[in-house]
Amino acid sequence: MTEKTASHYWNEETSILKLRRKDILLFEIYATTLLLGSIYSIYVDKWSITSYFGNSKNLINLIFVKRGWFWTSLVYFYHAWDQKRNKIDFKFISRYIVATLWWMFVTQWFIGPGLIDRTFALSGGSCKNFDGDSSVFIPLTASTCKGLNGSWSGGHDLSGHVFLLTHSSLFMLSENFSFILNNGIKATSTKVLFGLLGLWWWMLFVTASFYHTTFEKCTGFFSGILEWSIVYVFSSRMPAVADLLGSSDY
């Protein structure tokens, strides 16, 4: 299969909701990873975790995953500037801004607390046993609660790790899928991109194996594919979105 034929093959629509082969492939990779991790979690004693990666204080989690969108942005623009700088235009930047806004809305801020914290609170969760007078102030976010030595408990804890790792990976792969098919993994910047994708994949498997309930992982995954589905999968059926954001199929 030649490079052009490969690119054409993966961008062809299938009989499954007229989805392209590459979109089905990307969905299957991350859905399967989540499924395998969840199956593995059945055999893991979460109360006596000895695995290095099973400890949330491992350096990879603290240095990379906790700052996941920073590393995603850094590697994304490094690769784009090195390999596709002539393609960096308004629509290219617009797609990044949309992806960043979705990350921000889910994890950081959405007219107040982010959607993760809002979901937790709306499902009955709250900060308990924190340092302060509960009649004067009630922490509304997990980070504020933790900062006051409280316990953020009682609600639906949508998996932020599953969201971030899925969202970041699908964003980088969708932006570079055709480019990689046509150019391979020769350049240093492309190898760095694949290195980060590999790390994100591994940490997604770790998260699915050691943390959260099945439903919490599923809602995190749904949040992770939502923006991707609109911008990259179904945008061709939404003229307004397609006109504003263009296509990543370089």
UniProtKB/Swiss-Prot annotation:
**Keywords from the named record:** Endoplasmic reticulum, Glycoprotein, Hydrolase, Lipid biosynthesis, Lipid metabolism, Membrane, Phospholipid biosynthesis, Phospholipid metabolism, Transmembrane, Transmembrane helix
Annotated membrane-spanning segments are 24-44, 59-79, 96-116, 161-181, 192-212, 214-234
Locations listed in the record: Endoplasmic reticulum membrane
Instruction: Give me the glycosylation sites of this protein.
Output: 149
Q: Does the keyword Aminoacyl-tRNA synthetase apply?
A: no
Q: Which residues of this protein are catalytic?
A: 161, 212
Q: Which residues form a coiled coil?
A: none
Q: In what way does this protein cross or attach to the membrane?
A: Multi-pass membrane protein
**Pfam families this protein is in?**
FIT (PF10261)
One GO cellular component this record assigns the protein to is: endoplasmic reticulum membrane
- Could you state one GO biological process linked to this protein? phospholipid biosynthetic process
The GO molecular function terms of this record are:
coenzyme A diphosphatase activity; hydrolase activity, acting on acid anhydrides, in phosphorus-containing anhydrides
Which residues does the entry place in the Lumenal compartment?
A: 45-58, 117-160, 213
Enzyme superclass (EC): hydrolase
Q: Which reactions does this protein catalyse? A: an acyl-CoA + H2O = an acyl-4'-phosphopantetheine + adenosine 3',5'-bisphosphate + 2 H(+); (9Z)-octadecenoyl-CoA + H2O = S-(9Z-octadecenoyl)-4'-phosphopantetheine + adenosine 3',5'-bisphosphate + 2 H(+); (5Z,8Z,11Z,14Z)-eicosatetraenoyl-CoA + H2O = S-(5Z,8Z,11Z,14Z-eicosatetraenoyl)-4'-phosphopantetheine + adenosine 3',5'-bisphosphate + 2 H(+); hexadecanoyl-CoA + H2O = S-hexadecanoyl-4'-phosphopantetheine + adenosine 3',5'-bisphosphate + 2 H(+)
**What EC number(s) are associated with this protein in UniProt?**
3.6.1.-
Q: Which InterPro entries match?
A: FIT (IPR019388), SCS3 (IPR046400)
Role according to the record: Fatty acyl-coenzyme A (CoA) diphosphatase that hydrolyzes fatty acyl-CoA to yield acyl-4'-phosphopantetheine and adenosine 3',5'-bisphosphate. Preferentially hydrolyzes unsaturated long-chain acyl-CoA substrates in the endoplasmic reticulum (ER) lumen. This catalytic activity is required for maintaining ER structure and for lipid droplets (LDs) biogenesis, which are lipid storage organelles involved in maintaining lipid and energy homeostasis. May directly bind to diacylglycerol (DAGs) and triacylglycerol, which is also important for LD biogenesis.
User: Which family does the UniProt entry place this protein in?
Assistant: Belongs to the FIT family. Fungal FIT2B/SCS3 subfamily.
Family annotation (PANTHER family)? ACYL-COENZYME A DIPHOSPHATASE FITM2
> What name has this protein been given in UniProt?
Acyl-coenzyme A diphosphatase fit1
Q: Which organism is it from?
A: Schizosaccharomyces pombe (strain 972 / ATCC 24843) (Fission yeast)
